[in-house]
Amino acid sequence: MLDSLVSKLPSLSTSDHASVVALNLFVALLCACIVLGHLLEENRWMNESITALLIGLGTGVTILLISKGKSSHLLVFSEDLFFIYLLPPIIFNAGFQVKKKQFFRNFVTIMLFGAVGTIISCTIISLGVTQFFKKLDIGTFDLGDYLAIGAIFAATDSVCTLQVLNQDETPLLYSLVFGEGVVNDATSVVVFNAIQSFDLTHLNHEAAFHLLGNFLYLFLLSTLLGAATGLISAYVIKKLYFGRHSTDREVALMMLMAYLSYMLAELFDLSGILTVFFCGIVMSHYTWHNVTESSRITTKHTFATLSFLAETFIFLYVGMDALDIDKWRSVSDTPGTSIAVSSILMGLVMVGRAAFVFPLSFLSNLAKKNQSEKINFNMQVVIWWSGLMRGAVSMALAYNKFTRAGHTDVRGNAIMITSTITVCLFSTVVFGMLTKPLISYLLPHQNATTSMLSDDNTPKSIHIPLLDQDSFIEPSGNHNVPRPDSIRGFLTRPTRTVHYYWRQFDDSFMRPVFGGRGFVPFVPGSPTERNPPDLSKA
């Protein structure tokens, strides 16, 4: 059967039937990834990302052998497919599920790592390739190419580490790795686009400041656009109260507004990653509380499922695309050069990562008075390690820069594409497989005291895992009475922090307009909704 399927691949671009066959096989592979990923969940070396990648590699080898070297993949890679359809649900769900208190408590450190650190890493990689590539015969690259390579390989993929870390045992570390990963992706894409749009043939101090100003402009406006879209969705749902007639409308509106935020950012040439991430944070803080109970459950699982499928799709495809015969044919005459380029890039990634993680961690610790909030050396090693893996963002940016309509006719471009694939595969598989043992060694399981401070220790967390401990809705309807299990957290932190003043502003001005915690929709006749008027009469 597989022979007949693969035999149809050469005519994939011209035959609708062949496209359907390829899609069927790809969906079957996605199912296999999910099943095997579940079975290998407790494995010391494997995780779902590596499983999908290896299945993609195995499938690529099989197709390559059966098609006698004509093809290794089912679908043609498209950066539009990645940036428009696959990336938005992943980033939005990251913002929607984020532990907001931990994220904003460590916001300065996250921005140091995610924004400043990414620029440092990009600079070091760019300087390194400028020096090393000139000694290798790989083609003619200009300053813009070297800077673009720096931006491409500054984009991290911390999925493997996040799948291993326990955010209840190490909330600080998880928050830093998670937050930095999102900001890093956004920064890399913004820097890459800024480099692409600037004429770097006459680079001077004025142009450098202009480039920095453009970066800050994109960063700020993208964040504001995401927050504004989230607030609009909260206001509309709160005022019109769709759930009174249909929870389907609530769910549909939340999904469409989330996607609209990303597309608006692309329309205005902003950073869609930052926009949809902060839209997710705002919607989880306001909009999610304004919908009915059934809509809350549905949206939570829908966004998580879409994100999971998109991630699996990406790793599966990267595995298959790694064996694309057309890309490797261009560099087959000089395999040593391709290996040297890949090794140089991998070394620069490691050096560039270390160049900012340890110094910025030191600076961050200087500003922290509480010992529990400081980043110890073992945590710094984990943060450094989590950013060594490269994934789909690097692949997509490399395709954008070094291919034309999916083809790599220029030898230098082909070398960069194959080197990017090699770095992504090596870092994801090798570093990813070593992640569990490394974290087990550096971070032995914490005792119960750390989990007491986590957000999900009550049965209520089964239904509402998105919120932190001070964001749960009280069953009695009295939202001013503090919960008993939050007293410990209250006593162990300063009472006049930025978070304190934000809560004052939020409770006084934002929530009365946009809803949020405390706004409890009630659908007459629905026994599943919270706080019905009088359950005894039901």
Curated annotation (Swiss-Prot):
Similarity comment: Belongs to the monovalent cation:proton antiporter 1 (CPA1) transporter (TC 2.A.36) family.
Stretches that traverse the bilayer: 20-40, 46-66, 107-127, 217-237, 263-283, 303-323, 343-363, 379-399, 414-434
Practical applications: Transgenic plants of agricultural interest (e.g. cotton, Brassica napus) that overexpress NHX1 have enhanced capability to grow on high saline soils.
Topology, Vacuolar side: 41-45, 128-146, 193-216, 284-302, 364-378, 435-538
Assembly, per entry: Calcium and pH-dependent interaction with CML18/CAM15 (increases when pH decreases, better at pH 5.5 than at pH 7.5).
Cytoplasmic side: 1-19, 67-73, 95-106, 238-262, 324-342, 400-413
Further comment found in the protein's record: Inhibition of Na(+) transport activity but not of K(+) transport activity is mediated by binding with CML18/CAM15. Inhibited by the diuretic compound amiloride and its analogs ethylisopropyl-amiloride (EIPA), 5-(N-ethyl-N-isopropyl)amiloride (MIA), and benzamil. Also down-regulated by quinine.
Segments for region (Interaction with CML18/CAM15): 496-518
Functional description taken from the UniProt entry: Acts in low affinity electroneutral exchange of protons for cations such as Na(+) or K(+) across membranes. Can also exchange Li(+) and Cs(+) with a lower affinity. Involved in vacuolar ion compartmentalization necessary for cell volume regulation and cytoplasmic Na(+) detoxification. Required during leaves expansion, probably to stimulate epidermal cell expansion. Confers competence to grow in high salinity conditions.
GO biological process, one term: regulation of pH
Name by which UniProt lists this protein: Sodium/hydrogen exchanger 1
One GO cellular component term: plastid
GO molecular function: calmodulin binding; sodium:proton antiporter activity
Topological category with respect to the lipid bilayer: Multi-pass membrane protein
Chain's gene name: NHX1
Intramembrane stretches listed in the entry: 74-94, 147-166, 172-192
